[in-house]
A protein has these predicted regions:
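Short glycine-/small-residue-rich flexible loop motifs, especially phosphate/cofactor-binding loops
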Residues: 11, 36, 81
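Short, conserved catalytic/metal-binding motifs centered on acidic residues
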Residues: 6, 21-31, 46, 76-83, ...
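Active-site beta-loop-alpha junctions of metal-dependent nucleic acid enzymes
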Residues: 1-17
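An internal, acidic/charged active-site-proximal segment
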Residues: 14-71
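Residue-identity detector for glycine
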Residues: 7, 18, 28-29, 43, ...
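Basic, amphipathic alpha-helical segments enriched in Lys/Arg and hydrophobic/aromatic residues
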Residues: 66-124
């Protein structure tokens, strides 16, 4: 089911920023030849899926670019996991969209403060 969301999501990114991303690195649930071809048709240079399906191969300018994109995505996943576990974002019991947004916003701010203070303490 995720495979059908790839094209509309890429289009929304292009519409929002007015620019085609040079690189994409995506979850294996989006991996399909159709999505790879769609990204290429939009002008994306490097397309990396976390998990390869069948004969599909990642389209990258170099092996080092593929490695960098995979590591970047792993770092993002680690941040998301940290936020979910450390700031109880597994489930939001706050009622309403505005309250949900407030919970996420303040959790992200708290996470960033924790990361920054950790970096400052490490320098001491």
């Amino acid at each position: 089911a995720d495979k059908t969301l790839y094209g509309p999501t890429l289009d929304r990114v292009i519409d929002t920023y007015g620019k085609v991303p040079r690189d994409t690195t995506d979850d294996g649930g989006y991996a399909s030849i159709a999505n790879m071809e769609y990204a290429k048709s939009k002008g994306v240079v490097n397309v990396v899926f976390n998990k390869i399906v069948g004969s599909l191969k990642n389209q990258v300018s170099s092996l080092s670019m593929e490695t960098r994109l995979k590591k970047w995505r792993s770092g993002i996943e680690a941040n998301i996991s940290n936020i979910k576990r450390g700031f109880n974002l597994k489930r939001c019991n706050w009622k309403g969209w505005a309250n949900f947004q407030a919970k996420v916003l303040w959790s992200i701010i708290a996470y960033n403060i924790r990361v920054m203070t950790g970096l400052i303490v490490a320098r001491l």
